[in-house]
Each structure stands twice: as C-alpha cells, then as structure tokens.
C-alpha cells in the first residue's frame, strides 16, 4: 500500500505542476534526475 500512496502523491504533484504551469523541484527531479538515471 505504501507504493500506491507514493504513486498517487507523484501523480498529484505532476498534475498540480501542469495545472499551475510551474516546475517544482520535485517534478524537475522526477522528470530529469541529476544523475541521469530513470526511476
């Protein structure tokens, strides 16, 4: 259930960023990790 909660939190973060058209540090890190690896 923890994984589901994390997934929902990330989805909500991405949705909010799209609606507000602002990039939060979390979204930027999620889409473009500094180490160049995909989660």
From Swiss-Prot:
<comment type="similarity">
    <text>Belongs to the BAGE family.</text>
</comment>
<dbReference type="Pfam" id="PF08180">
    <property type="entry name" value="BAGE"/>
</dbReference>
<comment type="function">
    <text>Unknown. Candidate gene encoding tumor antigens.</text>
</comment>
<feature type="signal peptide">
    <location>
        <begin position="1"/>
        <end position="17"/>
    </location>
</feature>
<dbReference type="InterPro" id="IPR012530">
    <property type="entry name" value="BAGE-like"/>
</dbReference>
<dbReference type="GO" id="GO:0005576">
    <property type="term" value="C:extracellular region"/>
</dbReference>
<keyword id="KW-0964">Secreted</keyword>
<protein>
    <recommendedName>
        <fullName>B melanoma antigen 4</fullName>
    </recommendedName>
</protein>
<keyword id="KW-0732">Signal</keyword>
């Amino acid at each position: 259930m923890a994984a589901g909660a994390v997934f929902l939190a990330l989805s909500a973060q991405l949705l909010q960023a799209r609606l507000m058209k602002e990039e939060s540090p979390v979204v930027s890190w999620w889409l473009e990790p500094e180490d160049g690896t995909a989660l």
